[in-house]
Design a protein with these regions (language model features):
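Sec-dependent N-terminal signal peptides
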Residues: 4-13
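Flexible, processing/modification-adjacent segments and terminal tails
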Residues: 18-34, 43-44, 55, 84-147, ...
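Buried hydrophobic packing residues in well-ordered domains
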Residues: 28, 40, 71, 85-86, ...
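One face of beta-strands
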Residues: 38-44, 58-62, 67-71, 147-149, ...
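Sequence/structural signature of outer-membrane beta-barrel proteins
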Residues: 47-49
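Solvent-exposed loop/turn segments connecting transmembrane beta-strands
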Residues: 52, 76-77, 169-170
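An acidic-aromatic
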Residues: 60-107, 173
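Gly/Pro-enriched, hydrophobic low-complexity segments
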Residues: 123-205
């Protein structure tokens, strides 16, 4: 009898927590849903597992429109066409890589893709809050290289403030958002063309 009562109490509470996490994701997505485009400025670093060091904190920018994005970070420019193609230019090596990434691979480059593409492949839950922020946890339902994504949002209006991706090997990719603003994103922003990079080496995966 006690077991039945426990289950009756526990199951609705679990459902409520799930709706809360989904609601926070939907509220966060609204801050990025500008019809002409959204610009996000951020700082990011990669922390190796077992305190083996980290990359220098670097600044970058991300332009979003619908499911498309353009990432500028150091020598890297990465563009996703919103369908299936990712173009990735590395100025330090003058190489242009073209691939058809999985949703998990896209999330490693742009964790906010979770807000504009389906997160159906993840279990969502509210994690303990930090000062001034709510934290949404997303755990893959099947192995995909990511152990967990933590998305931080402002506790007042659910505006995205940062993200941390923990990979299966323990590596952490930490991103802190420093600004979100409206922008006018032209279609050409979401294409990288070989002709724009003289002498570039092109690799297609």
């Amino acid at each position: 009898m006690f077991r039945i009562l426990f289950l009756l109490l526990f199951i609705p509470a679990t459902g409520l927590a799930q709706r809360t996490a989904q609601g926070e994701l939907q509220a966060a997505a609204k801050h990025l849903a500008n019809p002409d485009g959204t610009r996000i400025d951020f700082q990011a670093e990669t922390i190796a597992p077992n305190d083996m060091g980290s990359s220098p904190l670097s600044s970058g920018s991300l332009i979003l429109k619908d499911n498309q994005f353009r990432l500028s970070f150091g020598s890297i420019t990465a563009v996703f066409d919103g369908k299936k193609t990712l173009s990735y230019y590395d100025a330090s090596e003058n190489t242009l890589n073209i691939s058809h990434p999985t949703n998990a691979e896209l999330a490693m480059i742009n964790p906010l893709i979770i807000l504009t593409r389906s997160e159906a492949g993840y279990r969502t839950a509210m994690l303990p809050p930090t000062k001034g922020e709510k934290v949404i946890g997303l755990t893959p339902k099947t192995a995909n290289g990511i152990k967990q994504i933590e998305l931080q949002v402002d506790s007042r209006d659910s505006r995205p403030t940062g993200a941390m991706i923990t990979l299966e090997d323990g590596t952490k990719i930490v991103t802190k958002i420093t600004g979100i603003s409206r922008t006018k994103a032209s279609p050409g922003l979401f294409r990288l063309m070989k002709k724009d990079y003289p002498g570039v080496e092109v690799d297609v995966y």
